[in-house]
């Protein structure tokens, strides 16, 4: 009997198996090259936006302070001018948000999370200019807001802009570049590339669709945005507190205690934010005129507070190294902490375009320093350096509120360049996260997104309920 095929030898079988394995390995990762190229473009665009936004805010603040310095000798001029300038700047931000892009209000991070789940729209053509110019107004007014929220939202919208400009149709490209822009935005805001990556993977874990394509895109976008940022601003740490000593092992229990305290503080802080948001909604009732007026009053108040006690207002980055160095007494630290909690709640809870990262980091630094000074007083045998507790506190409040401990740890270490404090940071942030979870607290951004979606559904249900009434009016002839 003749055979049309020849039986393979054992060597031929092995060779064929090796060839098949190689082909499977080569074909396993078919990453669309266009997505990776566009991720680099998104990173560059976001980095440039970050540099422009950062410098724009600094310029507005400098011009405001320069104008006040020119009339500093006249009390009759400096106080009214401080109120009026900050009020007008803030009103500009509130007006743009309320009239042109309501989704640009607040941090903007929950909007990106909702967009990643296809639950919130991404209208980049109006969000980017409104968030940019509105943020210049509110942050330039000296309000207690951060720059990172606007950067994350503008970065995510930049990703969607690139998708639309280059007509990328695949859902994978739309999702990957949206996440890439968000990560690149955080990286550009804090000069913290690894924290930008972890923020998307950890904090947005419910929305982020983990795949080889998406993770590579995020890496590339973060790298390019960081390169752009460092090209213009240098490679130094964004918060310079100096090199602190490592924490002795016999003091780790104090860091755990600090984490427990911050866990409770984080839950209370989040609850107060939600109550403040509800309070402002009751005040303005959706009327944009009332909202703009409220924003003007808040901005003017921050302008006056800047003259009375400058540490109570502003983003807080300038305050962090001063507080961490132990330049305030425990009583003064607690006073500043309470004052900044109130101003943070009012500014962020009102819906002003601006983030809460920086104010939160400042609050953590202040309370952490107060705790460290207290420990140094009660436990002199440990030789405690209060600044180490300040650094741990920065990450702990973030971890308890946002419920992203790994991001909080890496973010603070990258920002301060004190990597030797990683062990006390882990202990503090883990303790804060566990206590916050035990107390039933909800992650800040996820809770804000849930509230936004609930309002969206309520508005939709109201519209649907009104439709039959419109159809049955006498004017319809029915």
UniProtKB/Swiss-Prot annotation:
Reactions catalysed according to its record: 2 chloride(in) + H(+)(out) = 2 chloride(out) + H(+)(in)
Record-annotated site: Mediates proton transfer from the protein to the inner aqueous phase: 203
Position of sequence motif Selectivity filter part_3: 355-359
Cytoplasmic side: 1-32, 117-123, 167-176, 202-214, 282-287, 439-478
Site description Mediates proton transfer from the outer aqueous phase to the interior of the protein, residues in chain: 148
Side of membrane Periplasmic, spans: 70-76, 233-252, 310-329, 377-386
Subcellular compartments: Cell inner membrane
Keywords assigned by UniProt, alphabetized: Antiport, Cell inner membrane, Cell membrane, Chloride, Ion transport, Membrane, Transmembrane, Transmembrane helix, Transport
Record-level Gene Ontology MF annotations: antiporter activity; voltage-gated chloride channel activity
Keyword Transmembrane helix: yes
Membrane topology: Multi-pass membrane protein
Entry-linked Pfam families: Voltage_CLC
Family, per entry: Belongs to the chloride channel (TC 2.A.49) family. ClcA subfamily.
Subunit structure: Homodimer.
The protein's name: H(+)/Cl(-) exchange transporter ClcA
Organism this protein belongs to: Yersinia pseudotuberculosis serotype IB (strain PB1/+)
Lineage start: Bacteria, Pseudomonadati, Pseudomonadota, Gammaproteobacteria, Enterobacterales
Gene field: clcA
């Amino acid at each position: 009997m003749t055979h049309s095929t020849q039986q393979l030898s054992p060597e031929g079988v092995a060779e064929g198996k090796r060839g098949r394995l190689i082909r499977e390995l080569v074909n396993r990762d078919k990453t669309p090259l266009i997505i990776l190229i566009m991720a680099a473009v998104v990173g560059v665009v976001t980095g440039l936006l970050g540099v422009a936004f950062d410098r724009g805010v600094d310029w507005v603040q400098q011009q405001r302070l320069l104008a006040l310095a020119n009339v500093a000798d006249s009390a009759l001029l400096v106080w009214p001018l401080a109120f009026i300038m900050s009020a007008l700047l803030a009103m500009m931000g509130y007006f743009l948000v309320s009239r042109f892009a309501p989704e640009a209000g607040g941090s903007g991070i929950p909007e990106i999370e909702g967009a990643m789940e296809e639950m919130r729209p991404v209208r980049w053509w109006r969000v980017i200019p409104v968030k940019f110019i509105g943020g210049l107004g509110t942050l330039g007014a000296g309000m207690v807001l951060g720059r990172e929220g606007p950067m994350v939202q503008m970065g995510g919208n930049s990703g969607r802009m690139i998708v639309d400009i280059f007509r990328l149709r695949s859902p994978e490209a739309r999702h990957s570049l949206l996440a890439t822009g968000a990560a690149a935005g955080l990286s550009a805001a804090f000069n913290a590339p690894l924290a930008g990556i972890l923020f998307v993977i950890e904090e947005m874990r419910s929305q982020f669709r983990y795949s080889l394509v998406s993770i590579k895109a995020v890496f590339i976008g973060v790298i390019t945005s960081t390169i752009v940022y460092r090209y213009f601003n240098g490679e130094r740490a964004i918060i310079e507190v100096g090199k602190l000593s490592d924490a002795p092992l016999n003091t780790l229990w104090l860091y755990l205690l600090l984490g427990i305290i911050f866990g409770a503080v984080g839950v209370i802080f989040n609850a107060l934010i939600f109550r403040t948001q509800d309070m402002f909604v009751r005040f303005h009732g959706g009327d944009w005129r009332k909202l703009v007026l409220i924003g003007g009053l808040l901005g003017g108040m921050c302008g006056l507070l800047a003259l009375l006690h400058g540490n109570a207002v502003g983003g807080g980055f300038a305050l962090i190294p001063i507080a961490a160095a132990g330049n305030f007494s425990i009583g003064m630290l607690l006073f500043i902490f309470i004052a900044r909690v109130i101003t943070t709640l009012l500014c962020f809870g009102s819906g002003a375009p601006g983030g809460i990262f920086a104010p939160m980091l400042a609050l953590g630094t202040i309370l952490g320093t107060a705790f460290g000074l207290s420990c140094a007083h009660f436990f002199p045998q440990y030789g405690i350096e209060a600044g180490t507790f300040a650094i741990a506190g920065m990450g702990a409040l973030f971890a308890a509120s946002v419920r992203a401990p790994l991001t909080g740890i890496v973010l603070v270490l990258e920002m301060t360049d004190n990597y030797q404090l990683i062990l006390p940071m882990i202990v503090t942030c883990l303790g804060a996260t566990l206590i916050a979870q035990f107390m039933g607290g909800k992650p800040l951004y996820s809770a804000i997104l849930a509230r936004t979606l609930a309002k969206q559904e309520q508005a939709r249900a109201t519209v649907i309920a009104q439709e039959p009434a419109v159809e049955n009016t006498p004017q319809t002839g029915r």
